[in-house]
């Protein structure tokens, strides 16, 4: 803010799209250009024998479905040496105690998809386009309990950083509505 004031430049107005916070654990699928894949948590590669809240066991339990997703990506989308990382929240069931989602079946909710050739070359994808491309255009079966963050209601707000308090009441209303009746 002080740099903008110093240069006599107004602060930006930014549009934000938010989703409901899902209380679970971060998980990902990493799919290589050759169709091979593995699971990972935020910090490490996981397997059914060395798992994170049962995510790898669920993925490997649906191995045929994930093999089809990987085959679709590797033959139709990925270039040589490229990988795709599919990030999401593994939630529901007994993954987190004392949260509303614990009464729902376990599910993987994708919130981010990234294509990369190395750490420097990354392209984040819109999950809705990816969902359409893989599961609708190619007709690849969707694994059970797989969702996308935008399958549930999202919330759009515009923040004018010159007057950020103008959006404060709207944010409180959204928060209270979700607390009263979570849309997930």
PLM regions: where:
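Core nucleotide-handling region used for phosphoryl-transfer chemistry
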Residues: 1-184
């Amino acid at each position: 803010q002080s740099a903008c004031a110093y240069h006599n430049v107004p602060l930006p107005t930014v549009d934000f799209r938010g989703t409901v916070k899902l209380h679970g654990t971060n998980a990902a699928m990493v799919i290589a250009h050759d169709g091979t894949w593995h699971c990972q948590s935020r910090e490490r590669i996981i397997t059914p024998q060395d798992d994170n809240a049962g995510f790898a066991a669920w993925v490997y339990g649906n191995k045929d479905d994930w093999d089809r997703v990987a085959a679709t990506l590797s033959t139709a989308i990925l270039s040589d040496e490229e990988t795709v990382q599919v990030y999401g929240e593994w939630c529901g069931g007994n993954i987190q105690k004392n949260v509303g989602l614990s009464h729902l079946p376990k599910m993987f909710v994708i919130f981010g998809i990234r294509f990369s050739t190395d750490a420097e070359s990354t392209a984040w994808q819109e999950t809705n386009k990816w969902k359409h491309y893989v599961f609708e255009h190619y007709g690849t079966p969707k694994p059970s309990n797989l969702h996308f963050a935008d399958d549930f209601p999202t919330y759009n707000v515009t923040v004018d950083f010159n007057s950020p308090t103008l959006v404060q009441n709207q944010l409180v209303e959204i928060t209270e509505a979700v607390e009263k009746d979570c849309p997930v």
